[in-house]
Regions:
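Active-site loop/helix belt of alpha/beta enzymes
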Residues: 2-117
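Structural motif corresponding to alpha-helix initiation and N-cap regions
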Residues: 14, 18, 123, 174-175
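Short Gly/Pro-enriched turn/cap motifs at secondary-structure boundaries
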Residues: 58, 118-120, 179-182
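Active-site loop ensemble at the mouth of alpha/beta enzyme cores that anchors a bound cofactor
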Residues: 84-166
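C-terminal accessory subdomain/extension
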Residues: 134-241
Protein backbone atom coordinates (compact mmCIF):
# COMPACT_ATOMS: atom_id res chain seq x y z
CA UNK A 1 0.00 0.00 0.00
CA UNK A 2 1.83 3.08 -1.30
CA UNK A 3 -1.02 5.50 -0.61
CA UNK A 4 -4.31 4.02 -1.85
CA UNK A 5 -5.35 2.79 1.62
CA UNK A 6 -7.61 0.04 0.31
CA UNK A 7 -5.70 -2.96 1.59
CA UNK A 8 -2.18 -4.33 1.87
CA UNK A 9 0.84 -3.65 4.05
CA UNK A 10 1.92 -0.02 4.19
CA UNK A 11 5.08 0.41 2.15
CA UNK A 12 6.84 2.10 5.06
CA UNK A 13 6.05 -0.76 7.49
CA UNK A 14 9.34 -2.56 6.86
CA UNK A 15 8.98 -4.74 9.96
CA UNK A 16 5.83 -6.42 8.62
CA UNK A 17 7.28 -6.50 5.11
CA UNK A 18 10.35 -8.32 6.41
CA UNK A 19 8.32 -10.84 8.39
CA UNK A 20 6.09 -11.65 5.42
CA UNK A 21 8.94 -11.91 2.93
CA UNK A 22 10.94 -14.21 5.20
CA UNK A 23 7.92 -16.43 5.89
CA UNK A 24 7.05 -16.69 2.19
CA UNK A 25 10.63 -17.37 1.09
CA UNK A 26 11.18 -20.11 3.68
CA UNK A 27 7.99 -21.97 2.85
CA UNK A 28 8.23 -25.06 0.65
CA UNK A 29 4.94 -24.08 -0.98
CA UNK A 30 5.69 -20.50 -2.02
CA UNK A 31 8.35 -18.40 -3.71
CA UNK A 32 8.81 -14.72 -2.86
CA UNK A 33 8.49 -12.77 -6.10
CA UNK A 34 8.18 -9.16 -4.92
CA UNK A 35 5.76 -6.34 -4.23
CA UNK A 36 2.47 -5.62 -5.99
CA UNK A 37 1.15 -2.05 -5.85
CA UNK A 38 -2.06 -0.53 -7.21
CA UNK A 39 -2.36 3.23 -6.80
CA UNK A 40 -6.11 3.42 -7.33
CA UNK A 41 -6.31 6.77 -5.55
CA UNK A 42 -5.13 8.49 -8.74
CA UNK A 43 -8.70 8.01 -10.01
CA UNK A 44 -9.81 10.58 -7.43
CA UNK A 45 -7.57 13.29 -8.88
CA UNK A 46 -9.16 16.40 -10.34
CA UNK A 47 -6.47 17.07 -12.96
CA UNK A 48 -3.51 15.54 -14.77
CA UNK A 49 -1.09 17.52 -12.59
CA UNK A 50 -2.72 16.11 -9.46
CA UNK A 51 -2.35 12.57 -10.86
CA UNK A 52 1.38 13.13 -11.30
CA UNK A 53 1.63 14.62 -7.82
CA UNK A 54 -0.01 11.54 -6.27
CA UNK A 55 2.22 9.28 -8.34
CA UNK A 56 5.39 11.05 -7.23
CA UNK A 57 4.28 10.85 -3.60
CA UNK A 58 3.78 7.09 -3.98
CA UNK A 59 7.29 6.71 -5.41
CA UNK A 60 8.63 8.58 -2.41
CA UNK A 61 6.72 6.21 -0.11
CA UNK A 62 8.39 3.30 -1.89
CA UNK A 63 11.96 4.59 -1.61
CA UNK A 64 12.78 2.89 1.71
CA UNK A 65 11.10 -0.31 0.54
CA UNK A 66 13.32 -0.31 -2.53
CA UNK A 67 16.46 0.05 -0.40
CA UNK A 68 15.30 -2.81 1.84
CA UNK A 69 14.57 -4.96 -1.20
CA UNK A 70 18.03 -4.36 -2.66
CA UNK A 71 19.67 -5.45 0.58
CA UNK A 72 17.58 -8.52 1.35
CA UNK A 73 15.84 -9.73 -1.85
CA UNK A 74 17.63 -8.08 -4.79
CA UNK A 75 16.06 -10.49 -7.30
CA UNK A 76 12.53 -9.53 -6.29
CA UNK A 77 10.58 -6.89 -8.21
CA UNK A 78 8.39 -3.89 -7.48
CA UNK A 79 5.33 -4.01 -9.75
CA UNK A 80 3.20 -0.88 -10.13
CA UNK A 81 -0.17 -0.56 -11.83
CA UNK A 82 -2.61 2.31 -12.31
CA UNK A 83 -3.60 3.58 -15.72
CA UNK A 84 -3.94 7.33 -15.02
CA UNK A 85 -0.39 7.82 -13.73
CA UNK A 86 1.23 5.34 -16.09
CA UNK A 87 -0.29 7.18 -19.04
CA UNK A 88 1.12 10.62 -18.28
CA UNK A 89 3.94 10.40 -15.70
CA UNK A 90 7.61 10.31 -16.71
CA UNK A 91 9.29 9.18 -13.50
CA UNK A 92 9.25 5.45 -12.70
CA UNK A 93 12.43 5.29 -10.66
CA UNK A 94 12.99 1.96 -8.87
CA UNK A 95 9.93 0.36 -10.52
CA UNK A 96 10.66 -2.97 -12.23
CA UNK A 97 7.28 -3.74 -13.79
CA UNK A 98 4.32 -1.66 -15.02
CA UNK A 99 0.81 -3.10 -15.29
CA UNK A 100 -1.72 -0.45 -16.34
CA UNK A 101 -4.88 -2.53 -16.58
CA UNK A 102 -6.93 -0.11 -18.69
CA UNK A 103 -4.09 1.01 -20.95
CA UNK A 104 -5.19 -1.15 -23.88
CA UNK A 105 -8.73 0.25 -24.19
CA UNK A 106 -9.05 3.45 -22.15
CA UNK A 107 -12.55 4.89 -21.62
CA UNK A 108 -14.36 8.18 -21.11
CA UNK A 109 -13.42 8.28 -17.43
CA UNK A 110 -9.73 8.13 -18.39
CA UNK A 111 -10.34 10.94 -20.87
CA UNK A 112 -11.88 13.25 -18.30
CA UNK A 113 -9.10 12.41 -15.83
CA UNK A 114 -6.60 13.60 -18.44
CA UNK A 115 -5.04 10.20 -19.13
CA UNK A 116 -5.90 10.11 -22.82
CA UNK A 117 -7.63 11.85 -25.69
CA UNK A 118 -11.17 10.74 -26.45
CA UNK A 119 -9.90 9.46 -29.80
CA UNK A 120 -7.65 7.04 -27.89
CA UNK A 121 -10.64 5.15 -26.48
CA UNK A 122 -10.56 1.78 -28.27
CA UNK A 123 -13.80 0.22 -27.03
CA UNK A 124 -17.41 0.99 -27.88
CA UNK A 125 -20.65 -0.88 -27.26
CA UNK A 126 -22.90 -1.31 -30.31
CA UNK A 127 -26.45 -0.71 -29.06
CA UNK A 128 -29.64 -1.10 -31.13
CA UNK A 129 -31.98 1.87 -31.23
CA UNK A 130 -35.43 0.78 -30.02
CA UNK A 131 -37.33 4.09 -30.08
CA UNK A 132 -36.85 7.69 -31.19
CA UNK A 133 -38.37 10.79 -29.59
CA UNK A 134 -37.23 13.77 -31.70
CA UNK A 135 -39.65 16.10 -29.93
CA UNK A 136 -37.45 15.85 -26.83
CA UNK A 137 -34.14 15.14 -28.61
CA UNK A 138 -33.91 11.63 -27.17
CA UNK A 139 -33.59 8.08 -28.40
CA UNK A 140 -33.93 4.90 -26.38
CA UNK A 141 -31.36 2.15 -26.87
CA UNK A 142 -31.10 -1.48 -25.87
CA UNK A 143 -28.14 -0.80 -23.64
CA UNK A 144 -28.76 -0.42 -19.94
CA UNK A 145 -27.05 -0.93 -16.61
CA UNK A 146 -26.53 -4.64 -17.26
CA UNK A 147 -24.57 -3.77 -20.42
CA UNK A 148 -22.82 -0.49 -19.59
CA UNK A 149 -22.70 -0.66 -15.76
CA UNK A 150 -23.85 2.35 -13.74
CA UNK A 151 -20.49 4.05 -13.50
CA UNK A 152 -20.82 7.69 -14.47
CA UNK A 153 -18.78 10.82 -15.04
CA UNK A 154 -19.82 14.36 -14.14
CA UNK A 155 -18.43 17.18 -16.26
CA UNK A 156 -19.60 20.81 -16.30
CA UNK A 157 -22.44 19.89 -13.98
CA UNK A 158 -23.74 17.15 -16.30
CA UNK A 159 -23.70 13.45 -15.37
CA UNK A 160 -23.47 10.92 -18.17
CA UNK A 161 -23.12 7.15 -18.54
CA UNK A 162 -21.34 7.07 -21.89
CA UNK A 163 -20.37 9.19 -24.88
CA UNK A 164 -22.00 8.69 -28.26
CA UNK A 165 -20.48 7.80 -31.62
CA UNK A 166 -21.84 6.95 -35.06
CA UNK A 167 -20.71 3.70 -36.64
CA UNK A 168 -18.69 3.93 -39.85
CA UNK A 169 -17.31 1.26 -42.17
CA UNK A 170 -14.26 0.37 -40.08
CA UNK A 171 -14.46 2.62 -37.00
CA UNK A 172 -16.72 5.23 -35.41
CA UNK A 173 -17.20 8.99 -35.38
CA UNK A 174 -17.39 10.51 -31.91
CA UNK A 175 -20.15 13.08 -31.58
CA UNK A 176 -19.77 16.33 -29.58
CA UNK A 177 -20.03 16.14 -25.79
CA UNK A 178 -23.61 17.45 -25.86
CA UNK A 179 -24.63 14.00 -27.17
CA UNK A 180 -24.50 11.48 -24.33
CA UNK A 181 -26.22 8.68 -22.41
CA UNK A 182 -28.21 10.62 -19.83
CA UNK A 183 -30.13 7.87 -18.01
CA UNK A 184 -30.04 4.09 -17.53
CA UNK A 185 -32.54 1.48 -16.46
CA UNK A 186 -31.76 -2.22 -16.24
CA UNK A 187 -31.95 -3.02 -19.97
CA UNK A 188 -32.31 0.36 -21.67
CA UNK A 189 -30.60 3.71 -21.91
CA UNK A 190 -31.85 7.18 -22.81
CA UNK A 191 -29.54 9.09 -25.14
CA UNK A 192 -29.69 12.84 -25.71
CA UNK A 193 -28.92 13.87 -29.29
CA UNK A 194 -28.60 17.37 -30.72
CA UNK A 195 -30.87 18.57 -33.53
CA UNK A 196 -28.20 17.78 -36.10
CA UNK A 197 -28.13 14.09 -35.15
CA UNK A 198 -31.55 13.15 -33.76
CA UNK A 199 -33.04 12.52 -37.21
CA UNK A 200 -30.15 10.32 -38.34
CA UNK A 201 -31.28 7.35 -36.25
CA UNK A 202 -34.24 5.04 -36.68
CA UNK A 203 -35.36 1.99 -34.67
CA UNK A 204 -33.11 -0.93 -35.60
CA UNK A 205 -30.03 1.21 -36.26
CA UNK A 206 -26.88 0.69 -34.23
CA UNK A 207 -25.37 3.49 -32.18
CA UNK A 208 -21.94 3.24 -30.57
CA UNK A 209 -21.53 4.05 -26.88
CA UNK A 210 -18.06 4.78 -25.51
CA UNK A 211 -18.26 3.40 -21.97
CA UNK A 212 -17.38 5.26 -18.79
CA UNK A 213 -15.44 2.27 -17.43
CA UNK A 214 -14.27 -0.19 -20.07
CA UNK A 215 -12.93 -2.73 -17.53
CA UNK A 216 -16.50 -3.70 -16.70
CA UNK A 217 -17.75 -4.17 -20.26
CA UNK A 218 -16.20 -7.51 -21.41
CA UNK A 219 -17.43 -9.42 -18.32
CA UNK A 220 -20.90 -7.97 -18.88
CA UNK A 221 -21.14 -8.62 -22.62
CA UNK A 222 -18.90 -11.60 -23.40
CA UNK A 223 -17.01 -11.77 -26.69
CA UNK A 224 -15.67 -8.70 -28.47
CA UNK A 225 -15.54 -7.93 -32.19
CA UNK A 226 -12.74 -5.88 -33.73
CA UNK A 227 -13.20 -3.33 -36.51
CA UNK A 228 -12.46 -5.99 -39.14
CA UNK A 229 -15.22 -8.29 -37.90
CA UNK A 230 -13.03 -10.78 -36.06
CA UNK A 231 -14.38 -12.21 -32.81
CA UNK A 232 -12.10 -11.93 -29.78
CA UNK A 233 -12.84 -14.43 -27.03
CA UNK A 234 -12.40 -13.46 -23.40
CA UNK A 235 -11.70 -15.51 -20.30
CA UNK A 236 -14.89 -16.87 -18.78
CA UNK A 237 -15.79 -18.28 -15.39
CA UNK A 238 -17.31 -21.75 -15.39
CA UNK A 239 -19.18 -22.80 -12.29
CA UNK A 240 -20.70 -26.09 -11.21
CA UNK A 241 -19.13 -28.05 -14.05
Amino acid sequence: DAGYRRTGVKAEDLKTVSELAETISHSSKTHFKGFLIHNGHTYNAASASEIVKLHDKSLKNLSELYEWKQQHFPESIISLGDTPALSIADNFENIDELRPGNFIFYDTMQHYLGSCALEDVAMAVACPVVATHPERNEIVIYGGAVHLSKDSVTSNGKTFYGRVAMIRQSDWRILPASNYVKKLSQEHGVVHLDDGFIHQFEPGDLIMILPVHSCLIPPLLGNMIDTEGNTISIMKNYRNE
